[in-house]
Swiss-Prot record:
The gene is exgA. The active site is at E210 (proton donor), E307 (nucleophile). Keywords: Carbohydrate metabolism, Cell wall biogenesis/degradation, Disulfide bond, Glycosidase, Hydrolase, Manganese, Metal-binding, Polysaccharide degradation, Secreted, Signal. The lineage of its organism: Eukaryota, Fungi, Dikarya, Ascomycota, Pezizomycotina. Its cofactor is Mn(2+). It catalyses: Successive hydrolysis of beta-D-glucose units from the non-reducing ends of (1->3)-beta-D-glucans, releasing alpha-glucose. The keyword Hydrolase applies. It is found in: Secreted. This is Probable glucan 1,3-beta-glucosidase A.
Length: 415
């Protein structure tokens, strides 16, 4: 027999259930399980090439569009919306599944960063196709089941914030012209309202990926956009972390801005896109990684290295852009030849030489040491169609990425 207290509790529970079920799930704040980005170490991976396409991650998709398809905009433009939607829907449903999230968790990760473009929310009168949010919804459920945290990353903004193919549209930077910033705020707000209530899983959101200040993005206007983003997040879930790109400036240059606002600086570090860094031997690569780790310690805010990789060259097919040659083989103007790409163009890391495999493992370990000296890291990327050094799933399978990520074959190289 139930006591009066038990009966009262059951009535209250029933009423709570009715009221909860009356609220749409996407508007409901789940039990808060926020991450303290000041003190906790982020260990994670990006799901690149899934909901935002890049030719080097999934070259087979771009083969459908011929030479004119150099980014997601032109791919959809060439194919037309119906064919593009059919191809992309198949890709979205198969490239990343629950099994990937399980593998990521089993490898010792605690976060995934999921890039998504503004066109998933709204792209009127543009070639893009939508439908990505259904799969992003699935990803939140998969992360919950696997015990992973999610950071939503607005990877592409109207007009392109950097001119790179990974923004959705390669070419001139037109972000901050016309109504592009207002449209970006609208897209960000729609994503925040949809996903930040899932606060047991979605613990952070990124304002915009890689706004290119050296390439022409106005820093003052970028800060104004960031201020609007912070207001949006605080109105929905003030416990959520807000990742702000450094815009390719030193992270310390942002000191004094938005302190106490749950802000995390996002910096990206690649060696193969710099003519000096690409020329280094493995010992110098390790030193450079450790020096970068020391540099980011100068920030007065948490810093997560939101993109980095194990590749030491730009040999991967289409990495510099669709059908663009490599610096490493001296095919750029004023770029000396550093070596032969060989098996570094495509395939598995198992096809690399023994020395290349050893160098890859050592470089990855050095970066882990360096970035955990601040607040952590998110590797780019989880899966590709065959990009040696870039594919965490493949690196794990071949023993080139530490599992767990604290395992070391080379000791602490930044000590």
């Amino acid at each position: 027999m139930l006591s009066r207290l038990s009966q009262t509790a059951l009535v209250a529970l029933s009423l709570m259930t009715v009221l909860t079920e009356a609220v749409p799930s996407r508007m409901r704040i789940q039990t808060r399980d926020s991450v303290n980005y000041q003190s906790e170490i982020v260990r994670g991976v990006n799901l690149g090439g899934w909901l935002v396409l890049e030719p080097w991650i999934t070259p087979s998709i771009f083969e459908n569009g011929g030479g004119a398809a150099v980014d997601e905009w032109t791919l959809a433009e060439v194919l037309g919306k119906d064919k593009a939607r059919a191809i992309l829907s198949q890709h979205w449903s198969s490239f990343i599944t629950q099994d990937d999230f399980n593998q990521i968790a089993q490898a010792g990760m605690n976060h995934v960063r999921i890039p998504v473009g503004y066109w998933a929310v709204s792209a009127p009168d543009e070639p893009y196709v939508d439908g990505q949010l259904e799969f992003l919804d699935n990803a939140i459920s998969w992360a919950r089941a696997a015990g992973l945290k999610v950071m939503i990353d607005l990877h592409g903004a109207p007009g392109s914030q950097n001119g790179f193919d990974n923004s959705g549209r390669k070419g001139p930077i037109a972000w901050q012209q016309g109504d592009t910033v207002a449209r970006t705020v609208d897209a960000f707000k729609a994503l925040a309202e949809r996903y930040l209530p899932e606060s047991d899983v979605v613990t952070a959101i990124e304002a915009v990926n890689e706004p290119n200040i050296p390439g022409g993005v106005n820093e003052g206007q970028l800060k104004e956009y960031y201020n609007q983003v912070l207001e949006v997040v605080h109105s929905i879930n003030p416990d959520a972390g807000v990742f702000l790109s450094d815009g390719f400036l030193a992270t310390a240059s942002w000191n004094g801005y938005a302190n106490g606002e749950n802000v995390v600086m996002d910096t990206h570090h690649y060696h193969m896109f710099d003519n000096t860094l690409i020329s280094l031997d493995i010992n110098a690569h390790v030193r450079a990684a450790c020096e970068f780790g020391n540099q980011i310690k100068g920030s007065d805010k948490p810093v997560v290295v939101g993109e980095w990789t194990g590749a030491l060259t730009d040999c991967t097919k289409h990495l510099n852009g669709k059908d663009i040659p490599t610096r490493y083989e001296g095919q750029w103007a004023n770029s000396p030849r550093y070596g032969d790409c060989g098996n570094k163009r495509q395939g598995s890391s198992s096809g690399l030489s023994e020395q290349e495999r050893s160098d890859t493992r050592r470089f990855i370990e050095a970066q882990l040491d360096a970035y955990e000296g601040k607040n952590g890291w998110l590797f780019w990327t989880w899966k590709t169609e065959g990009a040696p050094g870039w594919d965490m799933q493949d690196l794990l399978a071949n023993g080139l990425f530490p599992n767990p990520p604290t395992e070391r074959q080379y000791g602490n190289q930044c000590a």
